[in-house]
Structures are given as C-alpha cells and as structure tokens.
C-alpha cells in the first residue's frame, strides 16, 4: 500500500518537473530554438492551428530560425501570427522560406526573463510539495484506518520526503541551466 502511494507520488512529481522544464523551454534565450515558436497559432481555414501543424521550423544558424510553410498561401498568415505574438520577432519572407532572426537580448530583458524563470521554478517546487502533502495525507488516512503501523507510516513519509528533495533538486538544476543560458552573450 505504501509502495503504491510512493510510486504515485513519484510519477506525479516527475510530471511536475517535466511541466516546469516544458514551460521554461518556451522562454526565449539568445539562441535560436524551434520551441520558441511552439505557442504560436496560425489562422488556417477559419480556425487557429499550431504553427507546427502547418509549417516546418528548423534552426538555420545560432540566431535564425527558418520556417518552411506546407501551403504557400499560408506564408503571410504565418508572418502575421509571429508578429502578433509577444516574442518581439520580425519575420522576413524569402520565397518559400520565412526567416526569423532573433535579436540579441538586452541586459534588462535578460534580468526580466530570469525573474520569470525563477517564478516558474517556484511554481514547480510548490507543485512538487503539493504532491508530497497529498501523499502524506493518504499515509495518515491509512494509519487512521489502522491499515499500516506508525513505523510504516514514518518510513513511508521519509521516503516521500527523499523523493521531494530529489525532484526539487531537479527543478533547481533546470533553473540554474536556464539562468546560465540566459546570461550567455
């Protein structure tokens, strides 16, 4: 019983860390990465469609993304969607390929982005701790129902705490990597 609770907590904590990593991967650094454009929706036959479904996005060089649209008539709509996003990017069309140069980040913008990343990290830590709280509540309920002994409950809570520490360390590691990436010139 305690093993199931521990495994469930581990799975949920892993999902929390993955969600955090996914969230910070969308934050723009000085380097070109196709994931920067993941959140962009293009107007396609009257409905908003993710950019990845209507175009191929590749890294051309360290500061440029190249977008190859599957349907040529969509070129202007893709450019418009990128300009309308709050990423501060200015695409330029060159035939069938749309190039998106990434301007270098200013020092002030880097610091703002670091604040955002730290906020996301704190959200990640809080969600991991919430999973710990849920697991501990389940263990206390088992103890109350006399399904497990106090020693088993204590041991299981210690295991859950070790898991929590481990996953919070993973969040902190990802945060440190992203901060270092943001401060690169």
UniProtKB/Swiss-Prot annotation:
Going by the UniProt record, its keywords in alphabetical order are: Cytoplasm, Protein biosynthesis
Which GO terms of the molecular function aspect are on file?
ribosomal large subunit binding
Read off the InterPro entries from this record: Ribosome_recyc_fac, Ribosome_recyc_fac_dom, RRF_sf
Localization, UniProt: Cytoplasm
Gene Ontology CC terms, in alphabetical order? cytosol
Q: Name one Pfam family in it.
A: RRF
Biological process GO annotation list? cytoplasmic translational termination
The role this protein plays is:
Responsible for the release of ribosomes from messenger RNA at the termination of protein biosynthesis. May increase the efficiency of translation by recycling ribosomes from one round of translation to another.
Question: What family is this protein classified in?
Answer: Belongs to the RRF family.
Q: Return the NCBIfam families for the record.
A: frr
Q: What is this protein called?
A: Ribosome-recycling factor
This chain's source organism reads: Pectobacterium carotovorum subsp. carotovorum (strain PC1)
Gene name, per UniProt, is: frr
